Amino acid sequence: MSEEKASEVAEAADLVLNGYAVTRDGENFRVVNLYSGKAAYVMASGELSETNMDEVESEIACRIVNENRRYIVAA
């Protein structure tokens, strides 16, 4: 992902943490790795719905959403 695009994604995000940008989509969440550009869609239940991330990145994305949900929802 280009630096310019990563900056745009980060600016639009509700939360940026450890290189991952999280954006609410209704009750669900979009998570983008700002370095690789890979993304995940995490359901309101905390379960992973779709991703092009590897297993480790997917786990990180889910953990970020689940552990920081109160900050994302308050945004």
What is the role of each PLM region?
Residues 23-54:
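Acidic, low-complexity, intrinsically disordered interaction modules
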Residues 1-21, 48-62, 66-75:
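Negatively charged, low-complexity tracts enriched in Asp/Glu with abundant Ser/Thr
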